[in-house]
Amino acid sequence: MTYLAAAIQMSSGPDKAANLEKAERLIRLAAARGARMVALPEVFNWRGKRAEEPAAAESLEGETLTLMGRLARELEINLLAGSITEHAPGQAKRYNTSVLFGPDGRSLAAYH
């Protein structure tokens, strides 16, 4: 039995929508080529100026991780959402958070 994993490398910038479109396209390509595990890089959804980071941060229920869970479920893959800047509700602190999704789209683990 073989198991194919894919590590996606991409250059992200300050345009979150463009970054998410690129990530989705590459995830779909990896899955179409047989990958059952796909890993995205650190800060794949946004990379910009430090002063703009608070506005780019998301909660675990935000746009980026909702999309990643949906893709994992749709493509029936394990998906490691490299990391995003997480803004924990009720806290001023931000975290560099990675989330692993299972083939059912549910979060299996998170590292903050």
Regions found by a protein language model. Name each.
Residues 1-6:
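Extreme N-terminal starter segment of soluble prokaryotic enzymes
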Residues 22:
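PLP-dependent aminotransferase-class I/II
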Residues 9-14:
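Short polar catalytic/cofactor-binding loops
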Residues 19:
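Substrate/cofactor-recognition hotspot
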Residues 16, 25-104, 108-112:
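Cys-nucleophile CN-hydrolase/nitrilase-fold catalytic domain and related Cys-dependent amidase chemistry
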